[in-house]
Structures are given as C-alpha cells and as structure tokens.
C-alpha cells in the first residue's frame, strides 16, 4: 500500500500526455489545473478499483477481472463508458491473441529451422563418415596390392 497520499497519484508525464491528446492544438493548461486533473484521475481510479473489488469479493475471488471493472462502471453510473470499454477490451484481446499466435509461429519457424540445420549437419556427418570409410577401403586395397 501507499505510505503517503502522493504515492497514489498517477505519473505527471502520463497525465500531461492524456491532457494534450484531449485538448485542441494551441490550448495550454496551467500547472494547477494539471495537478487538479491528476488528483481527480487518481481518486477515480481508486474508487473504480474499490467498486470492482467489491464485485470480486462477492464472487469470492481475490483477482479483479474485466467484468468486475465493467460492473463497477455501471454501479458508479458511468454506463456511457461501458460500450467503449468493451470495444477496447475486445481490441486488446485480439491484439494479445495476435501477439501470442505470432510468437507461437515464430517458435515453430525457429524449431523447424533448427531441425533442418540438424538434419543438414547429420547429412554432412554421414557424408564425412562415408568418405572416411571409402578412404579406409582404398588404403586397405592399396596395402593388399
């Protein structure tokens, strides 16, 4: 847990970036206003987390999940955010699935390449052994002659 109230604040760089993205070009914001928005965002996150935790506790779980957060939004009367949040969640899940599939494909490709290299290495070793055997036979034939 946080030892001081300031520890609960969101990073200023993140808040500043979000504010700049939300405002039209050329609009500035005072340090005091940025600080107020930062505190408000921190309070919102804490409140949403507390509400979501209540849903997790009702489900006898210690881990918050997406449905807990969505239920908390509804309980907090932020229904208008539920649809965009669901869309963002689906996009996130698609991205993660794509990353996982890409990672698995990369691993398969690497395994296939490694296997091909091992096969090639075995072929070279077998060819070397055949040459050595031929050389041995030739030496034996020369000795016999």
Swiss-Prot record:
One of its GO terms (molecular function) is protein heterodimerization activity. GO terms for cellular component: CHRAC; epsilon DNA polymerase complex; pericentric heterochromatin. It holds the Pfam family CBFD_NFYB_HMF. Keywords: Acetylation, Coiled coil, DNA-binding, Nucleus, Phosphoprotein. Ubiquitously expressed. SUPFAM superfamilies: Histone-fold. It is found in: Nucleus. The modification Phosphoserine is found at residue 121. Residues 92-123 have a biased composition (Basic and acidic residues). Residues 124-145 have a biased composition (Acidic residues). GO terms for biological process: chromatin remodeling; DNA-templated DNA replication; nucleosome assembly; regulation of DNA replication. This is DNA polymerase epsilon subunit 3. The gene is Pole3.
């Amino acid at each position: 847990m946080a030892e001081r109230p300031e520890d609960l604040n969101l990073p200023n760089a993140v808040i500043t970036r979000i504010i700049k993205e939300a405002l039209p070009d050329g609009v500035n914001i005072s340090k005091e206003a940025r600080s107020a928005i930062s505190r408000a965002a921190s309070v919102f996150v804490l409140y949403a987390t507390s509400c979501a935790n209540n849903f997790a506790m009702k489900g006898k779980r210690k881990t918050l999940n997406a449905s807990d957060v969505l239920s908390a939004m509804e309980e907090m009367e932020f229904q208008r955010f539920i649809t965009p949040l669901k869309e963002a969640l689906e996009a996130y899940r698609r991205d993660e699935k794509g990353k996982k599939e890409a990672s698995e494909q990369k691993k398969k490709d690497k395994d296939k390449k490694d296997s091909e290299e091992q096969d090639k290495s075995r072929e070279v070793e077998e060819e070397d052994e055949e040459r050595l055997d031929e050389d041995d036979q030739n030496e034996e034939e020369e000795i016999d002659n």
